Each structure stands twice: as C-alpha cells, then as structure tokens.
C-alpha cells in the first residue's frame, strides 16, 4: 500500500524539478575532486536528471557519495572511487549490463578528454563495470567501497526502503506489473544469495541486518 501511495504522489514530480535542489551540494563535491571542469559536471548533472529516472537520479548519486564518506571516515574516499560513483549510472536505460558498459565507456572518453592519466581513467572504468554485479574480487578494496555504497539503500529504514522500491518501479514504468514483479523477485533473490552482500566490515555493521530484513520482506 505504501509503495502505491508513493508512486501516485511525490514521485510524479518531474525529475529535473526534484533535482534542482541537489545541484549545489553535488557541485561542491564535484569541485573538490575535479576543479575547473564545470562543463563535465553539467553534462553529468543533465544525465542524472533525465526525466525517465526516478530511483537512478541525483538523489541516488548523492546517497552513494555520502555512503562513501561513511565507509571511509575519517579519511576521504579515493578520487577514482568518487569519479566511478559519478559515472556508474551516467548512462541509464534500464538495461542491466549494457548501462554499466556504456557508462564505463563514457567515463573513459570524458575523463581522458579532461586530461586524467590513463591509469586513473582505466581504474575508474573498471570500478564502474563492477557495479553490474557488485562482486569485487578478493583484495579489491576500492571495488568493495563502491559496490557497498551503491547497495547501501538496501539497508535503509522501512519507509526509506519502500520509497526506493516505489522509485525503482517508476524507472520500469514501461513494464507491466506481472513482468516487473517477476523480474524484481529474481533481483531480490539474487541479492539475498550474495555472500557477502556487503564486502567491507563497516558496511556490514551499518546495513547488513536491515538489508536482509528489507529484502526478505519484499518476498513475503
């Protein structure tokens, strides 16, 4: 019931209008890692503000960046991880695997043009591709950070989680209810089967118990 109410209420506000209030905090974060690259910031902001996005918009981007802060506090997250967060859903059409690959290629193109070293560009693209399955290898600390931050929404409070599910449903508004329900159930089961779901000790402390509660609740 709550999910349906959310779908029919504030989530129908156009994405660009919802995201206007996030421009300043996002720009401050961007300027901290890529000063002088305003054109690239505006390009990414436009992409994250596309009207077909509900969950995969600027709110999600800011949430991932804030989650990275939590995971690395008191240190700052590595710049490559932060840039990967900025690019990880820069291309979003709702096609799993293809979106991440196109986002990684976009990162390679834009960051190379911005003058970043080839090794840094390659690392950002590698991290973006990891978000297609959230399975970083053993010892991949930066990959673990990004994957955990991307999935941090799973460990939210029940009302926040309901808003997340409602927003995801709107991202797939072109799919019928039965097909979406089947696809979503498969995603939830996949997430529950991930061992570990979160890879960093800090993320496990912050979100694991709530994430399992929320995911299991979707299947009941």
Where are the regions a protein language model picked out?
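Short, well-structured alpha-helical segments
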Residues: 38-45, 58, 62, 78, ...
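His-Asp-centered metal-binding catalytic motifs of divalent-metal-dependent phosphohydrolases/nucleases
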Residues: 64, 79-94, 103, 125-132
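Extreme N-terminal basic, low-complexity initiation segments
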Residues: 1-11
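Histidine- and acidic-residue-rich, metal-dependent catalytic cores
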Residues: 47, 103-137, 189-191
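Divalent metal-dependent phosphate-bond-processing catalytic cores, especially two-metal-ion Mg2+/Mn2+ enzymes
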Residues: 19-32, 49-56, 67-75, 87, ...
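An amphipathic alpha-helix signature
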Residues: 27, 31, 41-42, 65, ...
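Active-site metal-coordination segments of metallo-dependent hydrolases
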Residues: 50-60, 92-104
């Amino acid at each position: 019931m709550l999910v349906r109410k959310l779908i029919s209420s504030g989530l129908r506000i156009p994405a660009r209008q919802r995201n206007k209030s996030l421009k300043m905090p996002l720009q401050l974060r961007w300027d901290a890692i890529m000063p002088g690259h305003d054109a690239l910031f505006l390009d990414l902001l436009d992409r994250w503000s596309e009207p077909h996005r509900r969950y995969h918009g600027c709110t999600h981007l800011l949430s991932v960046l804030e989650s990275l802060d939590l995971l690395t506090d008191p240190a700052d997250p590595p710049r490559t991880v932060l840039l990967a967060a900025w690019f990880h859903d820069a291309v979003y059409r709702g096609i799993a695997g293809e979106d991440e690959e196109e986002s990684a290629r976009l990162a390679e193109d834009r960051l190379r043009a911005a003058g970043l070293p080839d090794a840094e560009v390659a690392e950002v693209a590698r991290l973006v591709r990891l978000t297609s399955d959230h399975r970083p290898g053993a010892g991949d600390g930066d990959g673990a950070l990004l994957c955990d931050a991307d999935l941090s929404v799973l460990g939210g409070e029940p009302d926040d989680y309901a808003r997340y599910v409602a927003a995801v449903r709107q991202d797939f508004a072109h799919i019928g209810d039965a097909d979406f329900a089947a696809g979503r159930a498969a995603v939830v089961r996949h997430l529950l089967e991930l061992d570990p779901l979160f890879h960093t000790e800090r993320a496990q402390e912050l979100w694991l118990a709530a994430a399992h509660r929320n995911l299991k609740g979707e299947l009941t």
